[in-house]
Design a protein with these regions (language model features):
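Transmembrane core module of solute transporters
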Residues: 1-40, 210-220, 224-320
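Juxtamembrane loop-transmembrane helix junctions in multi-pass integral membrane proteins
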Residues: 21, 25, 55, 75-78, ...
Length: 320
């Protein structure tokens, strides 16, 4: 669900912004989702330690489904962005707790293999996303509802099935652990990044980089980012433990992940618009053009996961 929704929107965004006349907010439909999912991901692990894996995982599914329904019913770009942010809150739990649950039930030596399988499922969903998004976007109406709205409504039956399956088979003993949850850190992080993005992606291009609003949002965003880092150094259980960056391996892999993620998500979001507007392709054709990228993700996820489990070596794979 979470992987599908990261990519299914990309090929339909052109149709959405045309209906809502929201080209200036184009990237925010994706950014809002990624921002809230990123902020909520670290919180879910601690919350599930307190209340149990299954109930928190199911809460994440319900939150995601509610966001999906409201996104499909949106009447303007502001509503769509807000409901996509709600979807992201649910998606953060789906992404985080999947790995946590794997860690609970799979021996350490075998986790690489299962995480490889998870990566493959993630990749297949990412492949299907642009194709499904293109299919729905190219159909003006389906069952009397605008085609693009189905990119959100399709989540509902899948999510309901997931709720039924997790209720039936996910029985992990509850081991309560006391945690201090860093809500303030999450708020500071989301607010600072949001303000900086508002300055860089909306006010700067629209009103000019010297405009008072552009400068104000950028300055406040940077100040909040500094406050976030200061708070994380003092928080009992920070959302982003700064001491982790003293670990050379963690620092390098985080940097690599940021660079690769920026390029990958930039391509996933902007390439469909390029194919449709500049090249004149349909939404479905734009989705087909993304298949090579997604197939590369699928294949390397499977192979690297199995190789790490088999040999126990991991450093060579980021280099490769």
């Amino acid at each position: 669900l979470a992987a599908l929704d990261q990519t299914i929107v990309s090929t339909a965004l052109k149709n959405i912004v045309e209906e809502f006349d929201g080209l200036n907010h184009y990237t925010w439909v994706v950014t809002a989702y990624l921002l809230t999912s990123t902020a909520s991901t670290p919180l879910y692990g601690k919350i599930s330690d307190i209340y149990g894996r299954r109930v928190v995982f199911q809460f994440a599914i319900v939150t995601f489904l509610l966001g999906s329904f409201l996104a499909g019913a949106s009447q303007n770009m502001e509503q769509l962005i807000a409901t996509r942010a709600l979807q992201g809150v649910g998606a953060g739990g789906l992404m985080a707790l999947t790995f946590v649950i794997i860690g609970d039930i799979v021996p350490p030596r075998e986790r690489g293999k299962y995480q490889g399988y998870f990566g493959a499922v993630w990749g297949l969903s990412s492949v299907a996303g642009p194709l499904l998004g293109g299919f729905f976007a190219d159909n003006e109406t389906i069952l009397g509802i605008a085609g693009w709205r189905w990119i959100f409504y399709i989540n509902l039956p899948i999510g309901i099935i997931s709720l039924i399956v997790t209720s039936a088979v996910l029985h992990i003993p509850k081991v309560k652990r006391e945690h201090s949850i860093d809500y303030l850190g999450a708020v500071l992080m989301v607010t600072s990044v949001s303000l900086i993005l508002l300055s860089a992606s909306i006010y700067g291009p629209q009103y000019g980089w010297g405009d008072s609003r552009t400068i104000m949002y950028a300055v406040i965003g940077v100040i909040l980012a500094v406050l976030f880092l200061m708070w994380e150094g003092k928080a009992k259980e920070p959302i982003l433990p700064l001491y982790l960056f003293k670990n050379h391996t963690f620092s390098i892999t985080s940097l690599l992940g940021a660079v690769i993620g920026a390029g990958m998500f930039g391509a996933i979001v902007m390439l469909p618009l390029y194919f449709q507007v500049v090249k004149g392709y349909s939404a479905t054709e734009a989705g087909l053009k993304l298949i090579p990228l997604m197939l590369g993700i699928v294949s390397t996820s499977i192979v690297s996961g199995k190789m790490i489990s088999k040999h126990g070596h991991y450093k060579r794979f980021p280099i490769m």
